[in-house]
Regions:
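Short, conserved micro-motifs composed of acidic
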Residues: 21, 33, 95, 102, ...
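Periplasmic OmpA-like peptidoglycan-binding domain that tethers envelope proteins to the cell wall
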Residues: 347, 352, 592, 600-673
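Periplasmic peptidoglycan-binding/tethering modules of Gram-negative envelope proteins
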Residues: 434-596, 657-658, 673
C-alpha cells in the first residue's frame, strides 16, 4: 500500500533515524537507516555517477523516496519519473502516479494509474484511484462556491507545525520541530529538530515552548487537555527493544491546579507492546478518550478507537473499542478532534483528493456513527490535510443569509503555499450564495434504507509466478471462487464469483458477518464486516461498502518466509513482535483444516555448526508450540531446524554483509503433501 502519510505519523514513530550518523558512507545505507535527510545529498551525487541504467534507476528511486519522506513532493516526482524511465519498474510508476495525485495533477494521475494497471496485469487494482481523481477535479472546480476561506496562521515556521489543540485559557498548543525545540541535535529522518509541544495565542506570531516536564530531547506531540487544563494526554516515541524502531505511546500527566507543575508523565495502561497509539482527543466531560492505533485486531492500517474511564476498573479504564466500520477502513484513520457531538478525523482510506482528507461524522439518536462526510476543497487538497479544530466555545448568531459566518478554526496541511512542511491554517466558512430554487413535483416516498456490500475475491500477482517469496506487484480478480457469507446467528448465503471476482449482497442492521472464500489450489481466507454502529442517513439511505478477500496459491513443499519473526541473541523464545505473524498463520490453519505444515528455522553462517543446528531446532519447536497454544493440533505441525545449511543468500561467510546475514536468518513454513 502506497498511501501518503502526514510527516509526523511517519517520522515520530521511528528511532532508526536518530541524530547520530554512525559510519554512513553512502546514500543507500542512509536510506536503509531511515536517515532520509542525510541520504538526499549523498544520493544526488551517486545518481550522477551511476555507470549503468539499472544502477541509475535504483538510486533515482531511493532519492525520490527520500524527498517524499522529507516532504519535498515536487522533487520526489522528478526522481520517480527518472527511476521509471531507467527501467526501475512498477514501484516507480506507482510512486509517480500517487505523486501526481498529491500535486493535484489529476488528469496525468489518471493516465499513470491506467498505465500502472496495464503494467502489472490488473486494471482492477487502481480503478478506485482513477475514479477518485475525477471526483477530486470536480471538487476543485466547486471550491470557490463553498464559502470557505483559508489563510496561513501567523505563528508558523519554516519547519513543521501541526495538530493544534486548545489549552484551558484559549491558547493553542501544537507540535513543531522548529529551531526552538529542546533537542540538541537534528533528527536525521527530517533534517530538523526533534518534535516538541509549543503554546501560542491564536493571533500571535511568537509561540513558546510548552513545558519542560513534558518535552524531552526526543519526539513528543499531538496533545489534548481537559477543560480545566489540569490533565494532558500526549504522544511520546519510546524504544521497546535496543536497535529496533521506536513505538508511539499516549502518556498522561496531571497537576493539582493551573499554577502547579505537571507530575511525571505515565503511559496509559491499556496500550500493547509493539503497537502505535497516536493522536489523543478528549471528550468535553473528560471521560472518553479517542485515539488512533495500528492494532492488528482492528479493521486495517490505523483505526480510530475510544476508551472510557472507569473508576471501578483496576487500570482506571475500560478496554478500548474500535469505532464502527463505516468510519474505519483498511487504510488509515487518524487525528480525531471533537466539537460537541461532532467528530472530525483524517483518512486516506475513504474516497478523497490525494493524501489524508478531513471528514466529519456525528452520533445519531441510536448512538451510532453517521456516514462520514468529506469536507471537500478547499479544506481538503491533494496533499495531507488533518487536525481540523473548530474554534472552541464560539457562540455565533444564526447564519441565515449569504456571507454570515458559520464556523471558524484551524487545520493542518502540507499543501502548496506552506512556509515549511506541515503548516497550521486558519479557516472561516460563511453561508454561500443562494442557489435558484428547484421545483420538485414528485410525491414524497418513504425512505427505504439499505446496507449493501460489494465484495471481490482476488489473488496476488507475483513477480515470479512460481516463487511464493517473490515480490507482490498487485492483485487481480480470481474467477470461480466460492464465497460463503455467514451472519452472526447462523444465516448463510453462498456466491460463486465469475471473471470479475465480484459478489454483492444486502446486509442486515447491527449484524456481524464473516465472508469465507475458497477455491481448489488456494488457501481459504475470510474477511469480517459489521454493520453495528452504522447510523441511518436520510441524505444517503442506500449505503454501499466494500471488502476484498485475497486467496494465496498453495505451493506444496516450497518454503515461504514468515516476515517479522526475530529472536534475541542465543534465545528461542517467541518475542511479542513475532506474535502477530504467528497469529495470522494460526488463522490460516484454522481456515484450512485439511493441510499440514512444516515450520523451519535457519541461522546465518556465524557460529559453530552444531550450535546453530541446535539453536534453529529449538526456535522451530518454539514456533510450533506457540501455534499449539493457539489451538492448532500438534499432528498438523512439524518442526525442523536447518542451522546454516540452506542459506537464502549463499555469500562467502567472511564477506557476507549484515543485510545478507539477516536474509539468511529466517523462519519459514511450507505446506506438506
Amino acid at each position: 500500500m502506497n498511501k501518503l502519510f502526514a510527516l509526523f505519523l511517519l517520522a515520530l514513530c521511528f528511532c532508526g533515524a536518530c541524530s547520530y550518523t554512525l559510519k554512513i558512507k553512502d546514500g543507500r545505507t542512509a536510506y536503509e537507516r531511515k536517515q532520509f535527510a542525510v541520504a538526499v545529498p549523498m544520493l544526488e551525487k551517486e545518481v550522477a555517477k551511476a555507470k549503468t541504467r539499472v544502477e541509475r534507476g535504483q538510486l533515482a528511486y531511493l532519492l525520490g523516496d527520500s524527498y517524499r519522506r522529507t516532504g519535498q513532493d515536487k522533487r520526489a516526482l522528478t526522481w520517480f519519473k527518472t527511476a521509471y524511465d531507467n527501467n526501475y519498474g512498477a514501484d516507480a510508476l506507482k510512486a509517480y502516479a500517487f505523486g501526481l495525485k498529491k500535486l493535484e495533477r489529476y488528469a496525468e494521475a489518471r493516465e499513470a494509474f491506467k498505465n500502472l494497471g496495464i503494467e502489472i496485469g490488473s486494471p482492477y487494482e487502481y480503478r478506485k484511484e482513477i475514479t477518485a481523481a475525477t471526483i477530486a477535479e470536480d471538487w476543485l472546480k466547486q471550491a470557490p462556491a463553498n464559502g470557505w476561506k483559508l489563510e496561513d496562521a501567523p505563528f508558523n515556521s519554516a519547519q513543521n507545525d501541526f495538530a493544534p489543540t486548545y489549552f484551558a485559557d484559549g491558547r493553542l498548543v501544537f507540535t513543531s520541530d522548529r529551531a526552538m525545540a529542546k533537542s540538541e541535535g537534528n533528527y536525521n529522518w527530517t533534517g530538523q529538530k526533534f518534535m516538541d509541544l509549543f503554546i501560542v495565542e491564536p493571533e500571535a506570531a511568537s509561540p513558546q515552548v510548552f513545558d519542560g516536564q513534558l518535552n524531552t530531547g526526543g519526539n513528543e506531540g499531538t496533545a489534548c487537555f481537559n477543560m480545566a487544563g489540569t490533565t494532558v494526554y500526549f504522544v511520546r516515541a519510546v524504544g521497546a527493544y535496543k536497535g529496533d524502531d521506536a513505538f508511539c505511546k499516549i502518556y498522561l500527566a496531571q497537576k493539582s491546579s493551573a499554577e502547579s507543575a505537571w507530575n511525571d508523565p505515565t503511559p496509559l495502561p491499556f496500550q500493547k507492546e509493539k503497537i502505535n497509539y497516536l493522536h489523543p482527543a478528549l471528550s468535553a466531560d473528560g471521560n472518553t478518550l479517542y485515539f488512533a492505533s495500528n492494532d492488528p485486531e482492528g479493521w486495517g492500517g490505523y483505526d480510530l478507537y475510544s476508551a472510557q474511564r472507569n473508576a471501578k476498573s483496576e487500570s482506571g479504564w475500560d478496554e478500548p473499542k474500535v469505532l464502527s466500520r463505516n468510519l474505519n477502513t483498511p487504510g488509515n484513520e487518524l487525528f480525531p478532534t471533537l466539537d460537541a457531538d461532532t467528530l472530525y478525523f483524517a483518512s486516506d482510506g475513504l474516497p478523497g483528493m490525494g493524501g489524508l482528507d478531513v471528514f466529519r461524522t456525528y452520533k445519531s439518536e441510536r448512538n451510532a456513527w453517521a456516514p462520514p462526510i468529506n469536507l471537500k476543497s478547499p479544506v481538503n487538497s491533494g496533499s495531507d490535510d488533518f487536525g481540523f479544530l473548530p474554534t472552541r466555545g464560539a457562540k455565533l448568531p444564526a447564519a441565515t443569509k449569504p456571507g454570515d459566518l458559520m464556523r471558524s478554526g484551524f487545520l493542518t496541511s502540507n499543501r502548496t503555499g506552506t512556509r515549511g512542511g506541515d503548516d497550521i491554517w486558519r479557516f472561516e466558512q460563511r453561508v454561500p450564495p443562494l442557489k435558484p430554487p428547484q421545483r420538485d413535483t414528485a410525491p414524497t416516498k418513504p425512505l427505504a434504507y439499505k446496507l449493501l456490500l460489494e465484495g471481490y475475491v482476488l489473488e496476488k500477482i507475483l513477480t515470479a509466478p512460481d516463487d511464493p517469496n517473490s515480490k507482490v506487484l498487485g492483485r487481480k480478480p480470481l474467477a470461480g471462487a466460492t464465497v460463503v457469507a455467514e451472519a452472526a446467528g447462523g444465516k448463510k448465503q453462498t456466491f460463486t464469483v465469475k471473471e470479475d471476482g465480484f459478489f454483492k449482497m444486502e446486509m442486515g442492521e447491527s449484524t456481524d458477518y464473516t465472508f469465507t472464500a475458497a477455491l481448489a489450489g488456494y488457501l481459504s481466507n475470510n474477511a469480517k464486516f459489521s454493520t453495528k454502529g452504522i447510523a441511518k442517513d436520510p441524505t444517503n439511505p442506500t449505503q454501499t461498502f466494500e471488502i476484498e478477500i485475497v486467496l494465496d496459491k498453495i505451493f506444496r513443499n516450497r518454503e515461504i518466509v514468515l516476515e517479522n519473526i526475530y529472536y534475541d541473541y542465543d534465545k528461542w523464545d517467541i518475542r511479542p513482535d513475532a506474535e502477530p505473524t504467528l497469529n495470522r498463520l494460526a488463522d490460516v490453519l484454522r481456515q484450512n483444516p485439511g493441510i499440514r505444515i512444516q515450520l523451519g528455522s535457519h541461522t546465518d553462517c556465524r557460529g559453530n555448526d552444531g550450535y546453530n543446528q541446535t539453536l534453529s531446532q529449538r526456535r522451530a519447536e518454539s514456533a510450533v508450540n506457540y501455534l499449539i497454544s493457539k489451538g492448532i493440533e500438534g499432528a498438523r505441525l512439524a518442526a525442523i531446524g536447518y542451522g546454516e545449511t540452506q542459506p537464502a543468500d549463499p555469500c562467502a561467510c567472511a564477506r557476507c554483509t549484515e543485510n545478507e546475514h539477516q536474509i539468511n536468518r529466517r523462519t519459514t513454513f511450507k505446506v506438506l503433501e
